[in-house]
């Protein structure tokens, strides 16, 4: 057998998310698999909505701006980095954002424009690979293990993509490069904004050991609090817990945390999928009993839901209200329309109708949530697709 078999370009298999090029033995005439380590890039546009507004309106550049509804119950969809220095962040009540940053400029938002720019970004991605998994309008995973330009180093592809986004679209993006999705996502957050971070396999263990537990993908405030309670604050401390112990504490989330702490994540980059739903919910520090306070929270949650819906580019026809009471009993109510629910004028009346009588008898409410589902179109998913949404119980952060 020839010890230097020729690589047959364009012929490869997908096995558990790993790109497996086929090599050919010129003596025996057989193909065989060469399993290679994956090269995953996570691209995240920097303050996307706000950056598009600043790019298109020179008077906004260098100023603290927030995209969202400028009303007493408005919610911040995205804040510029100038505004973030004052503590303003997405999902914050606009009234609070203005208190933190009195000179904040509120922009209503141009969502058709954001969608157009998002497609331009994805066109750039497509020059390098067809294995693209959009997570929202402003972020995506790319598997460049086998890429269209035969560039051997994923970091060079990430550099090219960031440069093209800057030169062609006049925006900035942060990129994370590693051998799986978990680490690539963490890496893209590590040097924001306008940053590039690579986590090499031989340095992944030390990198994870130093991470704060809050930086682990899928760990929200509630999970972090429980981990802190048992003395776990870093990746190194998480690694000391057995898989069985973590499963006892967190159910299905336990084995996932066990693997993440060791840099293991076999999820593939999935190209054909459709988000099933978009939602948000809030647990209150003090249970709600006053009808006016409940109505205020319903309106605030609608505003936040609209922001998430637009960011995810999602259109659904069914609105579901979730209510959890102080005694931990729970109800859900749903209403459907024959068209997409995409505006406040469409969603708020349904939310108010669903919430009628939910605190009958002054029953104290601990949690309120709203979810949009029943998407307009359906895209067939390959087996095992969207492992994160189907298996991993992400918390609302």
PLM features: what roles do these ranges have?
Residues 9-249, 254-256, 372, 376-397:
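Gly/Gly-Pro- and Ser/Thr-rich, intrinsically disordered tail segments characteristic of DNA damage-repair
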Residues 34, 42, 215, 223-367, ...:
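DNA-contacting surface of Y-family translesion DNA polymerases
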């Amino acid at each position: 057998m020839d010890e230097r078999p020729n690589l047959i370009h364009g012929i490869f298999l997908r096995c558990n998310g790993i790109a497996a090029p086929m090599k050919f033995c010129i003596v025996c005439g057989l193909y065989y698999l060469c399993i290679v380590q994956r090269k995953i890039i996570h691209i995240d546009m920097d303050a996307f909505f706000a950056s598009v507004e600043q790019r298109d309106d020179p008077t906004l550049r260098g100023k603290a701006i927030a995209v969202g509804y400028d009303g007493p119950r408005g919610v911040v969809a995205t804040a510029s980095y100038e505004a973030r220095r004052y503590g303003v962040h997405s999902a914050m009540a606009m009234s609070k954002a203005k208190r933190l940053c009195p000179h904040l400029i509120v922009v209503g938002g141009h969502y058709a424009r954001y969608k157009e720019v998002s497609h331009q970004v994805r066109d750039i991605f497509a020059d390098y690979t067809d294995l693209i998994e959009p997570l929202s309008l402003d972020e995506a995973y790319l598997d460049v293990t086998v890429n269209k330009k035969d560039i051997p180093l994923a970091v060079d592809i990430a550099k090219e993509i960031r440069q093209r986004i800057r030169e062609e679209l006049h925006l900035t993006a942060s990129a994370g490069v590693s051998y799986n999705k978990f680490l690539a996502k963490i890496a893209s957050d590590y040097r924001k904004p306008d940053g590039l971070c690579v986590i090499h396999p031989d340095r992944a263990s030390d990198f994870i050991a130093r991470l704060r537990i809050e930086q682990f993908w899928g760990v929200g405030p509630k999970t972090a609090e429980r981990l802190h309670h048992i003395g776990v604050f870093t990746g190194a401390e998480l690694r000391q817990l057995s898989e069985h112990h973590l499963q006892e504490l967190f159910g299905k989330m336990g084995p996932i945390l066990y693997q993440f702490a060791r840099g293991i994540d076999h999820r593939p980059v999935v190209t054909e999928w459709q988000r099933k739903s978009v939602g948000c919910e809030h647990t209150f520090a003090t249970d709600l009993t006053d009808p006016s306070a409940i109505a205020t929270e319903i309106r605030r949650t609608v505003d936040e839901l609209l922001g998430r819906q637009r960011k995810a580019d999602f259109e659904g026809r069914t609105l579901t209200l979730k209510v959890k009471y102080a005694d931990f009993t729970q109800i859900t109510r749903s209403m459907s329309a024959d068209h997409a629910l995409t505006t406040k004028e469409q969603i708020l009346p349904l939310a108010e109708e669903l919430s009628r009588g939910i605190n009958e008898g002054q029953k104290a409410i601990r949690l309120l949530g709203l979810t949009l589902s029943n998407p307009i179109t359906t895209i067939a998913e390959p087996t095992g697709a969207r492992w994160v949404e189907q298996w991993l119980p992400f918390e609302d952060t």
